[in-house]
A protein has these predicted regions:
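Thiotemplate assembly-line natural product biosynthesis machinery
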Residues: 1-22, 75-83
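Phosphopantetheine carrier-protein modules
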Residues: 16-36, 53-66, 81-83
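Catalytic nucleophile serine of serine hydrolases
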Residues: 39
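Conserved catalytic core of two-component sensor histidine kinases
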Residues: 43
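Short, cationic-aromatic polyanion-contact patches
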Residues: 68-75
C-alpha cells in the first residue's frame, strides 16, 4: 500500500501543489474538504488512478467521504486490484 500512497501523493503534489514538500501532504490530509482538490481536480485524480493502477472506480468509491484522503484513495485502489 505504501507504493500506491506515494504514487498518488506525488501526482497530487506535482499537479496541484507544485513546490510543496511531501511532508506537507500526509496520508490523512483532507484533499477535497480542505480545498486542495476541487471537483474537477478530483476527477483528474480518479482518471490518473484508474490509468496508473488499472482499476475501475465507481461513484461509491469516489464520493467525497471515500475519496478525501490519500489513504482513502489507496484503499479503494487496493480493494479494486485483482487478487
Amino acid at each position: 500500500m505504501k507504493d500506491v500512497k506515494e504514487t498518488i501523493r506525488q501526482y497530487i503534489l506535482s499537479t496541484y501543489l507544485p513546490g510543496e514538500s511531501s511532508d506537507n501532504l500526509r496520508d490523512d490530509t483532507p484533499l477535497q474538504t480542505s480545498g486542495i482538490l476541487d471537483s474537477l481536480a478530483a476527477l483528474s485524480v480518479v482518471s490518473f488512478v484508474q490509468q496508473e493502477f488499472g482499476v475501475e472506480l465507481d461513484t461509491y468509491d469516489t464520493s467525497v467521504e471515500r475519496f478525501n484522503r490519500i489513504e482513502d484513495i489507496a484503499t479503494a485502489v487496493i480493494r479494486k486490484q485483482p487478487q
